[in-house]
């Protein structure tokens, strides 16, 4: 029998159980055990309400970063990156080490994180780096007959929609649409197909439909690989922001407001001397509750769960966002 302590967290209502492997003495768990635990704990029918995944936090394998984040989705699959999750991990580790900025190791890169100015309503807000950014088909991987997909119709996917693809480093397929397409079932049908066995994206892909709201604002809805529709996907919002800036010839460094069903974030971008692009995702890092479970014979049983006051703060932002989005329909 094992007792596992957790913090229930969310970034833009993309929710997770954050589990510190060192404090729980589970650093020797196998990947299979981590996956099985995630499947059980993240079940939406569980008494704790489930989650989109587990953020396993442990020591970095490199010198410099203050910790490492590993993301396991609710279906047990591994995500190479999660922007919303990284903001909450950034907060957890920065508070643990009494810092305001540092580096955190993820599966594909070591990324800068720091505390940021609040989005409003006294919401804890953090900024995290999203990189590397790659457009080559092999980095997704993608097989649609082109080496780089940018604002192009792919008849096999849809006869009318123009798609762009980018890895950040997890793969994203993005198209800009109007409200009528958002209201249709096109996204669900396409995303479900591309995340089952198919010849175009053999490893699956995150599929985002984006609506322009103004010169400095977009709305993003994402079907996440391994999860399905979520309130928000941090890497998707970052990737969509970059594509918008490229399509509209926007200044990379200018903040873009990104609205989603889970709230609002800001995204900026920059290009270094070598021409490499990196993104900065700025948004909430909300701690919903702290608790513990018993894990025995592949069964997860709730022991404790104490809520914080932070969700009420975030819901004030959500109310503001919903009222704004109504005016854009």
Curated annotation (Swiss-Prot):
Superkingdom to which the source organism belongs: Bacteria
BP term (GO), one: lysine biosynthetic process via diaminopimelate
Reactions that this protein is recorded to catalyse: (2S,6S)-2,6-diaminopimelate = meso-2,6-diaminopimelate
Enzyme Commission no: 5.1.1.7
Compartments in which it is found: Cytoplasm
Entry keywords, A to Z: Amino-acid biosynthesis, Cytoplasm, Isomerase, Lysine biosynthesis
Annotated family: Belongs to the diaminopimelate epimerase family.
Identification of the protein by name: Diaminopimelate epimerase
Gene: dapF
């Amino acid at each position: 029998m094992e007792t596992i302590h957790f913090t229930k967290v969310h970034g833009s209502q993309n929710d997770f159980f954050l589990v510190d492997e060192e404090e729980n003495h589970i650093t020797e768990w196998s990947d299979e055990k981590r996956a099985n635990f995630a499947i059980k704990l993240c079940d939406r029918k569980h008494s704790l309400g489930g989650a989109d995944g587990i953020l396993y936090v442990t020591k970095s394998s490199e010198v410099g970063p203050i910790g490492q984040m590993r993301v396991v989705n609710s279906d047990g699959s591994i995500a190479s990156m999660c922007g919303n999750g990284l903001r909450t991990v950034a907060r957890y580790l920065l508070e643990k080490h009494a810092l305001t900025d540092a580096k955190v190791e993820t599966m594909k890169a070591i990324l800068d994180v720091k505390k940021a100015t609040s989005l409003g309503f006294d919401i804890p807000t953090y900024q995290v780096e999203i990189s590397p950014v790659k457009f080559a088909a092999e980095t997704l991987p993608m097989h649609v007959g082109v080496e780089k997909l940018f604002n192009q119709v792919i008849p096999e996917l849809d006869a009318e929609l123009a798609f762009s693809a980018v890895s950040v480093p997890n793969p994203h397929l993005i198209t800009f649409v109007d409200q009528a397409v958002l209201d249709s079932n096109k996204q669900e049908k396409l995303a479900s197909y591309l995340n089952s066995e198919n010849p175009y994206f053999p490893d699956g892909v995150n599929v985002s439909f984006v609506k322009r709201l103004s010169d400095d604002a977009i709305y993003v809805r994402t079907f996440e690989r391994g999860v399905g529709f979520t309130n928000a996907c941090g890497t998707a919002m970052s990737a969509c922001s970059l594509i918008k800036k490229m399509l509209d010839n926007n200044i990379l460094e200018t903040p873009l407001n990104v609205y989603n069903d889970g709230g609002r974030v800001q995204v900026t971008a920059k290009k270094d001397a070598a021409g490499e692009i990196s993104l900065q995702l700025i948004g909430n890092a909300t701690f919903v509750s702290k608790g513990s479970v018993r894990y025995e014979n592949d069964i997860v049983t709730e022991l404790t769960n104490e809520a914080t006051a932070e969700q009420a703060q975030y819901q004030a932002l959500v109310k503001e966002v919903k009222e704004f989005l109504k005016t854009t329909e």
